[in-house]
Amino acid sequence: MTQQIVFEIADSLGLPPGVINLVNGGVDVVNAILESPGIDAVSFVGSAKIARYVYERAAAHGKRVQALGGAKNHMLVLPDAVMDKTADNIISSAFGAAGQRCMAGSVIVTVGDAWDSLKPVLVEKTAKLTVGDGMDKGVGVGPVVSKAAQARILSYIEQGIADGATLAVDGRSPAADENGSFVGPTILEGVQPGTAVACEEIFGPVLSVIQVDSFDDAIALVNTSNYGNGTSIFTESGAAVRRYRNEVEVGMIGVNVGVAAPVAFFPFTGWKDSFLGDLHAHGTDAVDFFTKKKTITSRYFSAGPSGKFFVE
C-alpha cells in the first residue's frame, strides 16, 4: 500500500513514463528481474532465506546486490537502567506495527536482578495496550498481515510454552474483532537460549525474556545469534555502553533507544544472516551502490615533448 501511494504521488509530479516502475508479481517476475541483462543492481528486503536466494541468483548474473534478510533483535537491560523509560521503549519497539518490522525488538536480555525491577512496570504498561483497528484512535496494536501470519505467531507462543516459558502477558485471545487477524502483545518469561522463540524471527507482537547472570553472559548470548541486524542496551553506564558497542556482533546499536535504526544519512547496516552484500542501504553506501565509477587518465602533447598527465 505504501509503495502504491508513493508511485501515485510520483505520477502526479509528471515524471516521464518508465523512469520508475512498480511491478507486482510472484517468482516469475522476481526471477526476470534477477536475470535481466538490462538491470545492473538489485536491492532486496525480506526473509533471510529469500535474501540469500536473491543474492546468489542476482550475483550469478553479474549484478550488484544488497539483500537485507531476517532479524532477531535483542534489547539488553542492566540493573541500573531507568525502568519506566526502558519499558516505554521496549513496548514501542516490540509491539509497534504489531511486531511486523525488521527492527522490532523481540528478545529482552536482563542481567542480574534487572528483570525483578523491569517486570512489574513492563507488564502493567503492556496490559494497557488496546488491540484493534490501527486507524482507530487509542489503539496501540493493530492486526497482523493475514490469518496465516496469525496462526504462525500463535504457534510460536505455544511452542515457547512447551519449551518451558511462562506467560507474563497473554495475547492469544485479544479483545478485538474476531474476524480480524489479531494477536495481542505477548510476553514470555523464563525463555531458554536455543529455543525457537529465543532464536527464530517470529515477526509478530511476541517478546521473549531471557535472564542471565552477568554482562559477559549477555554479550555472549547476543553474539550466538545467526542474525546481526539491531540491538539496544538500556543502562546509565557509559563504560558498559562502550564495551557493548565494541564487542557485540550487530550492525546497528541503540543506547536507551528501543528501535536502533539510524536516520537515513547513515548506513542501514546488518551483519551475519541479516545482510548479504558489500554496500548497505541509506547513507553514502546507498549512493555508492547505485553509482558506477570511472577513472580517466589522459595527457595532451601540446603541454610539452612527453605531454602532461591528468587523472580525473
Each language-model region and where it sits:
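PLP-dependent aminotransferase-like
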Residues: 1-30
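Short amphipathic alpha-helical segments
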Residues: 4-5, 34-35, 53-57, 120-121, ...
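ALDH superfamily catalytic-core signature
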Residues: 16-19, 41, 48-192, 215, ...
